[in-house]
From Swiss-Prot:
Disruption phenotype: Lethal in 2nd instar larval stage. Enlarged nucleoli in larval salivary gland cells. It is found in: Nucleus, Nucleolus. This is rRNA biogenesis protein RRP5. PANTHER family: PROGRAMMED CELL DEATH PROTEIN 11 PRE-RRNA PROCESSING PROTEIN RRP5, PROTEIN RRP5 HOMOLOG. It comes from Drosophila melanogaster. GO terms for biological process: regulation of alternative mRNA splicing, via spliceosome; rRNA processing. The keyword Glycoprotein does not apply. CDD domains: S1_Rrp5_repeat_hs1_sc1. Residues 1057-1082, 1135-1145 have a biased composition (Basic and acidic residues). GO terms for molecular function: RNA binding. Residues 74-160, 176-238, 261-329, 447-511, 531-592, 697-771 form the S1 motif domain. Keywords: Coiled coil, Nucleus, Repeat, Ribosome biogenesis, rRNA processing.
Length: 1430
């Protein structure tokens, strides 16, 4: 306790009546717990502290030790290094307090060296463990800091000489002065010392070769010689050890120059109740020694005789009273060495570990600050009064509490810690502390099962801080059990994974995988035997390896090349791993044997929903037939993953499937490999036996999925057991060129079917083909089943959402609803609505359906019809057009008159990822669903190549119950592939067509028919012009040749059957749409052949007789040809009047086409229109960009890329800006859709101004959010073009976008160093605008204020400054700037600008009075200027 200072009032000393406070500042005992002043008592009270003045001299009658209340700010205190790390020291202070010292608090020289080390120069850097040792005595300035979150006060101790010696003056330095200095510079002949004393230069010569100090290191120094001057003094010093810091009594008379840690002579004058009172420096200063600071810990006060001198070390000096507090313990030891302080003859006592329990601790006395104990007969301990008081709540009696601590009584205590200055152990007898099993880290081992209690959320690790008994723990994000709600105060059963002694913390996990019985945890390298299986957690996933973490921080690497199968991993995945090899602390892992085989269908429980997919758990009986405690069969749990792509065959249903499979739900999943399962493959594996290597035969069609895909080769994993090799398929072998330059996009886990071409038994390899014609028969009924499965999956998702009471599940496709308009999406221009009566469900009207319509008013209500439902995002895709509302009805079965019908006119309303939604033009019908792909291997989307959103097309139905259709051209193409030659007159299904004649007779008949047709058609051909060759309607025609019960298709060419080539020929040709009045030159049918048949023969082989009776556009081609010939004959005999009308009609048609093409405002919808646009404006980059955007909207990436190249070669080289626009577009495409960005960038830099290209690249990378690439580009730009002014604002803007706003100011300094002086002002102004743009108005004002101060005549800067302040709403600041501007001495034209700006400000934001004031000031300035001119 600090003694109260005596006041010295003017007029002499008034001796007041002596009063005593019976109040303890450390502990309050008694029933009332109030501080009450009482009269002094005769009997001695060991718990009360007398702090009175008994006489006229300034003195204290208590040698109380230091505490947080008596410790004053900036007070110099001695400390001892108790713990140290590379970057911080923990220092023990008097009073059992602790302080921390950081790197920046050592010395200015060490701070400089540390900064250099951070920049890469580590030549002079040594961490704190090299500069300090445990037990090292230091002194420094104490600084109190309060933590904002807890309010607790902690201490920092600054050892910097400038802070410690800042109040000393160089003229007062004498020979023999001892201080702590830092090495500022190491020279050949000695060290320059950083003393911190004003005006003092210190130097230490290298007298001893073994002496080696580092720059920044602190050392105790003693002044050997000193030379004083008026403004500066120099001294030579020698280094001394901490046990040689003695100061002679006659040397120093100023207490400020006796620094803590110094050794002085202490003369005992009086025994106090809690220590010794005496004096130092020949009785010049009063000094005190607390009873806990005696030479030996167990010494008593009676051992020190009065008027005797003892060596003592200065602990601290109270700043106001100048009372000195000392310790007689000169040889301060750490806890490990405390037991060796006994006599040599006595046996050494083992030190007590912190956290251990002492069963019989004997009470010696009630001392100052607590109950003094004797531990293990030789060591000293103390139970603080605060600890005793904490055991009681409410009122209690002091005497009763302390009565149990009578002399020689014994107590069971736990060691809490050791104080190196007082040489004692501080303890606790609290039963909760003593009986706690888990008190310190030594009580916990990795692998233990413990109960942890959550006490705080840790956002840094995205986990929780927990407490296990009295030990702190961390529950990291990777080790959190999924689907568990966490709250502060919650208790969790956890497994200890790591015990970190350095951080004094342990890491735990409550995942079910770690809590299972019999789980093996790898906790030390000695147990890591090859072949053992341990539970581990994936902490990092890379392309070539997976990093796995076990217990106690042990890590292992799982190389993907060591895996037999392509296993998928994700960060946080916890599973078992087998040790493959170990080399010291390097562990290589592999996976244990598979629990499940390929195709095995298992009941799984969804445990967690991840970004990568669904985490599942499978529970099954253990293989060793063990039983649990209740006698039930022991169960094992296996954890796996269903990747996102394996939830469904259709991309748009993946996230919807995740919604209907929440955590805790159960379902069936098929094993694909090791721990990877699939939902989409369950129907396939449940419907047939899974093939293995022995059962695979050439010709089999097998399911597979993409493992890896490049532009050239695709790696496929086939679903064959015991065959783990990927099979390679060339991308060109997948294409049929059904759509020219159609992009091929293959992603991992994508489904493909393959046909086995060969099987090599010796090498155990399969050769396969994934070409569409190899794996698909061309039967459109298979396509119909594919779409039917898609619709069934959508229905299942809807049913699952209905069970979860999701609002979106109430709606159906084709249903009419009322919606409320909410606005237009700025990115997609789609119209956004909400459903009336259900605000949780939003509706979307796509911009392609909006057309040129004007947006309605906000909040207006409209009627709409649902076109499709996006269950993954709770969005209804709607149409508000009256025709769609009238023509669309809810879903139902297909009417009988539409079964198999073709040529129906329909409008494409939506084009989704898997299907296109169409509406029939006539009548009220449900929506028609068209597949995007005819088959999973239809990678070119040939089934929907002609479908464009918003266009009309002809469709043909391919399902007999559902509204499923394909474009008519696709239907005719694949129908023609299937028909035989004998049934060409009328379409016949292939399975029921029976031809009795032999192949040879069949060929003869066809040739005869062809010859007859040629003769009959010869006259007609000669009468017509031969300038045009009109193609037939059919793209390809084949004849089915029946041999030994098997069908073989062979193409027909001019009526002659050709041999089928060995390889499959192209089924698609890029022909234009057939003309309506096409003239057939093939021998398949003609008018004469139709007449030679008996009635009904044409439909004899057909299944559906009604098909031949329908008079729609799906009639047979033979009938169309006959009608065409008759119509052609009639047209030859047109009258003159009919010819004139036909010419007029044709002229009108051509005029309409020309007007439409000439209208610049017309919406471009076809490639021909865009071609005309770019031909008309070849140097206009906007036209080319519109064309490219049109192609990209149709996912024709290659065409768009080629068009950009074509534009670059077409635009004139003089149009540099237009060319730059095209290069920017090409770079943007390569960045988004390809991986050739760097190559295209090099090409662009060679063909354009590099600076312009780099600036465009920065914008492109920002728009595409490529932060990593942007940083490297900025580095390149700033190095290459640092003398260009334009570069720096662009880089600053990018820094703001990257979130590096703190580095913008450094960037400005770099810019000013690199740019010439004349460009400094524009650069500063640009940066100021950027600061203002990003709401950092203070920095912007600072920059502009400096400019206008230095260059007051720059009117443009004044204007920018004022405009910026007005825009930020800082009107008063803008007014102050203008008031500064108008007092400048400027020319009239410049002053006119200033006053106009001033007047405009007051008119807009001021009052009439301020406006009048500005006008008056302007008039006055004009008058004054006129006088000066005269």
């Amino acid at each position: 306790m600090v003694p109260n200072e005596k006041s010295f009032p003017r007029g002499g000393t008034i001796h007041s009546e002596v009063k005593t406070d019976d109040v303890s500042l450390n502990i309050v005992f008694g029933a009332s717990q109030k501080k009450v002043k009482k009269a002094p008592k005769v009997k001695e009270n060991l718990l009360s502290y007398e702090t009175e003045e008994q006489n006229g001299q300034l003195e204290a009658f208590s040698a109380e030790t230091l505490n947080m209340d008596t410790l004053q700010e900036d007070m110099l205190v001695m400390g001892v290094v108790k713990e140290l790390t590379a970057t911080a020291l923990q220092i023990a202070l008097p009073g059992r307090m602790f302080a921390r010292t950081l790197v920046a608090d050592i010395s200015d020289a060490y701070t400089r060296v540390a900064k250099a080390a951070m920049s890469g120069d580590t030549s002079e850097y040594h961490d704190l463990t090299e500069l300090f040792q445990l037990g090292r005595i230091v002194y420094g300035k104490a600084i109190k800091t309060e933590k904002l979150d807890t309010g607790r006060v902690s201490l920092l101790l600054s050892l910097k000489p400038a802070d410690v010696h800042g109040n000393l003056h160089h003229k007062s330095i004498k020979k023999g002065f001892i201080f702590s200095g830092a090495v500022a510079e190491a020279l050949e002949h000695g060290y320059v010392i950083e003393s911190g004393v004003q005006g003092l230069q210190a130097f230490v010569p290298c007298e001893k070769p073994a002496q080696k100090l580092h720059v920044g290191q602190l050392a105790f120094l003693k002044v050997k010689t000193v030379h004083h001057d008026t403004h500066q003094s120099t001294c030579t010093c020698v280094q001394v050890e901490q046990d040689q810091l003695r100061i002679k009594s006659q040397n120093e008379t100023n207490l400020d120059y006796i620094l803590p840690g110094s050794i002085v002579k202490f003369k005992v004058a009086k025994h106090l109740k809690d220590g010794l009172k005496g004096s130092i420096m020949n009785e010049s200063f009063s000094a005190y020694v607390n009873e806990h600071h005696l030479a030996n810990a167990l010494d008593t006060l009676d051992a020190y005789e009065l008027n005797e001198d003892y060596n003592a070390r200065v602990l601290y000096v109270m700043p106001l009273t100048k009372l000195v507090y000392l310790t007689l313990n000169l040889d301060i030891k750490t806890g490990a060495a405390v037991a060796k302080d006994q006599d040599e003859e006595e046996q050494e006592v083992e030190p007590i570990k912190v956290g251990s329990v002492v069963e019989k601790a004997k009470v010696l006395r009630l001392g100052s600050g607590g109950v003094v104990l004797l531990l293990n007969k030789k060591l000293k301990g103390i139970i603080s009064y605060g600890s005793i008081r904490g055991n009681f709540k409410g009122n209690y009696d002091k005497d009763e509490v302390l009565s149990k601590y009578g002399r020689k009584t014994k107590h069971k205590v736990r060691i809490l810690g050791y104080d190196v200055i007082e040489s004692l152990y501080y303890c606790s007898d609290d039963p909760n502390v003593v009986n706690e099993k888990l008190f310190c880290l030594e009580d916990i081992n990795a692998g233990d099962l413990v109960t942890a209690k959550i006490f705080k959320k840790d956002d840094k690790i995205k986990g929780w801080s927990v407490r296990i008994g009295k030990v702190n723990g961390i529950l990291e994000q990777f080790y959190l059990a999924p689907n568990v709600r966490y709250d502060v105060g919650q208790s969790l059963k956890c497994r200890v994974l790591e015990v970190n002694a350095e951080r004094k913390i342990c890491y735990v996990s409550n995942r079910a995988e770690y809590l299972g019985k019999g789980i093996k945890i790898l906790t030390d390298y000695a147990s890591a035997h090859v072949g053992n299986v341990y539970m581990g957690t994936v902490v990092r996933c890379e392309d070539t390896y997976v990093l796995v973490k076990f217990g106690n921080g042990i890590k292992g690497v799982l190389h993907r090349q060591n895996l037999k199968e392509n296993s998928s991993f994700f960060e946080g995945q916890t599973t078992k791993f087998r040790i493959l090899t170990r080399n010291k602390d390097q562990i290589t892992l592999t996976l244990p044997e598979d629990k499940f085989q390929l195709g095995e269908i298992c009941p799984v429980e969804i445990t967690n929903a991840l970004d990568a997919g669904l985490e599942v758990k499978i529970t099954f009986a253990a293989e060793d037939d063990e039983e649990d405690e209740d006698g039930n069969p022991k169960l094992e749990e296996f954890v796996g993953l269903i990747p996102l792509r394996l939830l469904s065959d259709h991309l748009e249903l993946l996230h919807a499937q995740m919604r209907v499979h929440p955590a805790g739900s159960y379902t069936d999943a098929a094993c694909i490999m090791q721990n990877i399962f699939s939902l989409r493959d369950v129907p396939y594996f449940s419907g047939q036996l899974t093939k293995d290597w022995q059962s695979v035969q050439v010709g089999d069609i097998i399911r597979s999925y993409v493992k890896h895909a490049t532009d050239q080769v695709v790696d496929l994993m086939v679903c064959v057991r015991n065959y783990n090799k990927p099979v390679k398929v060339h991308v060109k072998m997948l294409r049929l060129n059904a759509v020219k330059n159609a992009p091929v996009e293959l992603v991992p886990e994508q489904l493909l079917w393959v046909k086995v071409l060969s099987k090599e038994v010796e090498t155990k390899t399969l050769t396969v083909s994934a070409k569409l014609t190899d794996v698909w028969s061309g039967d459109l009924s298979d396509t119909a089943k594919l779409v039917e499965g898609y619709l069934n999956e959508v229905a299942q998702i809807k049913a699952g959402l209905e069970e979860a009471s999701a609002p979106i599940s109430k709606y159906s496709v084709g249903e009419k609803i009322n919606v409320v308009f909410k606005g237009i999406d700025a990115t997609t221009n789609d119209w956004v609505y909400t459903v009336e009566g259900n605000g949780k469900v939003s509706a979307l009207l796509l911009s392609s359906l909006v057309g040129t319509a004007k947006a309605p008013e906000m909040g207006s209500k409209h009627e709409a019809v649902i076109l499709w439902i996006e269950y993954s995002s709770d969005v209804l895709l709607i149409s508000n057009k009256k025709l769609d509302i009238a023509h669309i009805s809810p879903s139902g079965e297909l009417s009988t008159n539409l079964i198999g019908k073709a040529g129906m006119k329909a409008k494409v309303l939506l084009k989704l990822e898997s299907v296109a939604v169409c509406s029939l033009k006539k009548g009220t019908n449900p929506l028609v669903i068209c597949p995007i792909r005819l088959h999973p291997n239809d990678i070119e989307n040939s089934g929907s190549a002609e479908l464009r959103q918003g266009d009309f097309c002809n469709i043909a139905f391919i399902h007999d119950k559902l509204h499923i259709a394909v474009p008519e051209t696709v239907w005719r193409l694949w129908r023609g592939v299937k028909r035989t030659a004998g049934t060409e007159v009328a379409p016949v299904k292939a399975k029921k067509a029976k031809v009795e004649e032999s192949p040879k007779q069949k060929k003869t008949t066809i040739e005869e028919t062809s010859a007859q047709k040629k003769v009959k058609a010869k006259a007609k051909v000669e009468t017509k012009t031969e300038a045009k060759a009109i193609p037939t309607k059919r793209k390809a025609e084949v004849v089915e040749k029946i041999t030994n019960g098997q069908k073989k298709t062979q193409p027909l060419t001019n009526g002659i059957v050709k041999e089928k080539p060995k390889q499959n020929g192209k089924l698609f040709f890029e022909d234009k749409t057939p003309a309506k009045n096409a003239k057939s030159e093939t021998p398949k049918s003609n008018g004469a052949e139709g007449k030679s048949r008996l009635p009904g023969v044409s439909s004899f082989w057909e299944d559906d007789v009604n098909q031949s009776k329908e008079g729609s556009s799906d009639e047979d081609e033979e009938l169309n040809v006959a009608e065409t010939q008759k119509n052609a004959a009639k047209k030859k005999r047109l009258s003159a009047k009919e010819k004139a009308k036909a010419e007029i009609k044709e002229e009108q048609r051509l005029r309409e086409i020309e007007e439409r093409n000439a209208d610049p405002k017309a919406r471009l919808e076809t490639i021909d229109q865009y071609e005309r646009l770019v031909i008309a404006q070849p140097n206009n980059s906007i036209s080319w960009l519109k064309y490219i955007a049109f192609l990209l909207s149709n996912t024709e990436i290659e065409k768009a890329r080629a068009l950009a190249r074509r534009a670059i070669s077409t635009i004139s080289f003089r149009e540099t800006q237009e060319l730059r626009n095209m290069w920017s577009a090409l770079l943007n495409m390569e960045l988004v859709y390809s991986n050739n960005f760097d190559d295209v960038l090099k090409e662009a830099l060679n063909c354009n101004d590099p600076l312009e290209i780099y600036i465009s690249v920065v914008d492109i990378l920002k728009k595409n959010k490529r932060k990593d690439r942007l940083s490297s580009v900025l580095t390149t730009v700033l190095n290459k073009f640092k003398t260009e002014l334009r570069v720096w604002p662009v880089a600053a803007e990018a820094y703001f976008w990257l979130g590096k706003s703190d580095q913008v100011h450094n960037l400005l300094q770099r810019a000013l160093r690199a740019l010439p002086n004349q460009e400094h002002i524009p650069c500063i102004v640009s940066f100021a605008k950027l600061y203002a743009k990003h709401d950092n108005n203070d920095m912007a004002q600072t920059l502009l204020d400096d400019v206008v101060t230095s260059y007051p005549k720059r009117i443009d800067i004044w204007s920018v400054y004022v405009d910026m302040l007005i825009k930020a709403g800082l009107i008063d600041s803008a007014r102050n700037v203008l008031e500064r501007a108008v007092v400048q001495k400027l020319k009239p034209n410049k002053m006119q600008v200033i006053y106009k700006k001033y007047l405009q400000l007051e008119e807009n934001h001021g009052t009439d009075a301020t406006v009048a004031k500005v006008k008056q000031q302007a008039e006055q300035w004009v008058k004054n200027y006129a006088k000066t001119v005269k």
